[in-house]
């Protein structure tokens, strides 16, 4: 009975890395994608349109981050998404971070672009150390 327990534990140790939700390959692919997003987002509209993809990458990365990193980025996201309004009205429906609208006032556009740039910088720093 003792050897079968040891064999089961050994098998679990071999299988457990395969069950992890965010592999090193996924992390590397997301790291490259962050670089592509930041490099390709040259104008304000492309930055605003890419914000949701940055947030999606952050959500995938979230479980593997330290508590300090998670709190830092969560605080930033919550502070800025609460402040985003379109034509003086808070956005409605779905997640607060979906800030894309067909008509965005210049002030909201500037805020959204700044949010994209800061979020991209914070997430990129997670990959570079």
Swiss-Prot record:
Q: What is its main location?
A: secreted
Q: Which cellular compartments is it found in?
A: Secreted
Instruction: List the GO biological process terms.
Output: cellular response to heat; defense response to bacterium; innate immune response; response to bacterium; response to cold; response to heat; response to mechanical stimulus; response to oxidative stress
Which InterPro entries does this one have?
A: Turandot
- The entry annotates sugar attachment on 49
**Which keywords does this Swiss-Prot/TrEMBL entry list?**
Antibiotic, Antimicrobial, Glycoprotein, Immunity, Innate immunity, Secreted, Signal
A single Gene Ontology CC annotation of this entry is: extracellular space
Query: Quick one: signal sequence residues?
Result: 1-21
Q: Tell me which family the UniProt entry assigns to this protein.
A: Belongs to the Turandot family.
- What role does this protein play? A humoral factor that plays a role in stress tolerance; gives increased resistance to the lethal effects of bacterial challenge and stress. Regulated by the JAK/STAT pathway and NF-KB-like Relish pathway in the fat body, upd3 in the hemocytes and Mekk1 in response to septic injury and consequent immune response.
- Protein name per the record: Protein Turandot A1
Q: Which organism is it from?
A: Drosophila simulans
From the UniProt record, report the name of the gene that encodes this protein.
TotA1
